[in-house]
Amino acid sequence: MSSPKKKLSATEHHELLKLLQSRFKKNKDRHSNIEWAAVEAKLEANPAKLWSLNEMEITGGEPDVVAHDKKSGEYIFYDCAAESPKGRRSICYDHEALEKRKEHKPANSAVEMSADMGIELLTEDQYRQLQQLGDFDTKTSSWIVTTPAVRKLGGAFFMDRRYNTVFLYHNGADSYYAARGFRGSLKV
């Protein structure tokens, strides 16, 4: 994680906006009815959200706009990297699972890391929406929001794409793998 101040320098701010704009223009199919100027205005008005997008970026998420909520006026960003973000892999599901491990503990958990970044784990529906925009996680997998009933029994959900199909799986929440991370969403 970067600095706990949760504010970007003027240079970081400028560079991130430039990068996000470039990605936005390059991937118009993800947001065909959205104009960059409107997104940029929201970002400029919400520096804490820009900080969270920077955290998504530096951990390998390649965030991009995927939707506009007309009711709230918010723009929705998802991690759009082809594979689960590299800086967020080899982690278990949540803090409880991390504490449960007696040895070989991972460095962090998906739930804690996403909270620290100011983002939310994707839900199953959001993950499926993301997969409508391209082929993601064909070599990796990503933890997603898990129902309390499954979590209470020690499990957690993750998803990936194999054989041109999106799959939902379960695993022990304390498990972690080099090819499993998490994807996040952020509303601005």
Where are these predicted regions, by residue range?
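A binding-site-centric feature that preferentially detects glycan-recognition modules on secreted/surface proteins
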Residues: 2-120, 124-188
